[in-house]
Design a protein with these regions (language model features):
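Generic signal for short, ordered secondary-structure residues
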Residues: 3-4, 30, 82, 89, ...
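Active-site gating loops and adjacent loop-to-helix segments of metal-dependent hydrolytic enzymes
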Residues: 67-94, 98-100, 138-162
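Domain-core and long-helix interface of multi-subunit machines
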Residues: 4-17, 101-179
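Generic hydrophobic/packing signal
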Residues: 62, 81-83, 114
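Glycine-rich loops and low-complexity Gly/Arg-rich segments
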Residues: 27-30, 58-60, 83-86, 102-105
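Short C-terminal domain-edge/linker segments immediately following a structured domain
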Residues: 33-38, 64-66, 89-93, 107-112
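Membrane-targeting and insertion segments and their boundary/processing signals
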Residues: 18-21, 77-80, 84, 107-110
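An N-terminally biased module of ancient metal coordination in phosphate/nucleic-acid-related enzymes
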Residues: 1-72, 156-177
Length: 179
């Protein structure tokens, strides 16, 4: 089989670590993958080294979060093989800081409704560079409030049309500035 050019690891909101992702690709006979974590380049060099060791070509990339002002919606730009990854680092850091603040605020909102602590959610986010909605849902699953991360409780807490929504959207840059 060819490849998968949009893979996330535990460094962002993926379920697998870098090596486990590469081993899964090898097992599935996927020859090429691109590691494109959200606003994070941290796994690209390690991924390349591990990929070479296991015969899987790893393309370094990143999924950059931004906003399309014309549509008034979030957008995600996939960037591969950047000539200047150091120039992307500042943007990734700013986006991560915004995402971290939003995640911390969502944890506090969730803790008002459920007996969970920020420390427990952070434990469920272990290995990630940020706090994502699924980390909060994972903590609630571990506490027995749901049997799945992306089920009804997830929709109730994070869907914008839910009266119980605790979702807080991070502030991201204008897509035109990113391009």
């Amino acid at each position: 089989m060819g490849g998968d050019l949009h893979c996330h690891t535990r460094l962002s909101d993926g379920s697998l670590g870098i090596e486990d992702l590469i081993l899964l690709a090898q097992k599935l006979k996927i020859e090429t993958i691109a590691i494109t974590d959200h606003d994070c380049l941290a796994g690209t060099v390690r991924g390349k080294v591990i990929g070479d060791r296991h015969g899987v070509q790893v393309i370094p990339g990143v999924e950059i979060s931004c906003v399309d002002p014309k549509r008034e919606r979030r957008a995600h730009l996939l960037c591969y093989l950047s000539d200047s990854p150091d120039r992307l680092e500042g943007l990734c850091r700013r986006n991560s800081l915004s995402r971290r603040k939003a995640g911390q605020y969502m944890i506090l909102k969730a803790a008002k409704r459920f007996p969970i602590t920020p420390e427990f959610v952070l434990k469920c986010a272990s290995g990630s560079t940020n706090i994502f909605k699924q980390h909060i849902a994972h903590a609630l699953m571990e506490c027995g409030y749901t049997h799945t991360i992306f089920g009804e409780l997830y929709q109730d807490l994070f869907s914008s049309d839910s009266p119980n929504c605790i979702s807080v959207e991070p502030s991201f840059p204008d897509v035109r500035g990113v391009l």
